[in-house]
Amino acid sequence: MKKFFQPSLVLTTLVLALGGTNAGAAATVTFTQPEGYVDMPFAPWEKERVMKELKEHFEKLGAKLPQGHDLTVEVLDIDLAGRIEPQLHFSQDIRVLKGRADWPMIVLRYRVESQGKVLASGEARVDDKSYLDHFNRYSANESLRYEKRMLDDWFKTVLNQ
């Protein structure tokens, strides 16, 4: 049996592992008692996907901080945009967005540190009651597009980034 060395695969893996990150900025994200969150999907794999995508988004935001700054986020509660509508004939329920009392909301604690010194910290209830009325740079196919835009706005406003 011959073993083939694929330099393009190795190079691609290395670029993906090292590229796109700010070596000096770090983000740590934790989800405190997610089983008690106001609005999370029912299926365990969907819950994992939501938390993974939010974690990755906070990491992208943390990478925008100046080199040497570290962002710590503790997610305390999540209420996703829209409401779940159970579907009897399909394997997945659907999320319906009406723009009424179904806006996205995330409660979190945050801290930005540099060299052991706390630069900013607090607890925030991040929400967007008019989430359907704003321009959204995330495509219609993007998962959690309203939550991501809302977090982008919070990050720009609170952390001036």
Regions found by a protein language model. Give the residues of each.
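Bacterial N-terminal signal peptides that target proteins for export
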Residues: 1-10
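Classic N-terminal secretory signal peptides
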Residues: 9-18
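N-terminal segment of the mature soluble domain
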Residues: 31-77
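Short secondary-structure boundary motifs at beta->alpha junctions and helix caps
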Residues: 44, 121-151
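A short, structured loop/turn motif at beta-sheet edges
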Residues: 63-71, 111-121
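Surface-exposed short loop/turn segments
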Residues: 75-113
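Short, low-complexity, Pro/Ser/Thr/Gly-rich segments in the mature regions of secreted, periplasmic
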Residues: 151-160
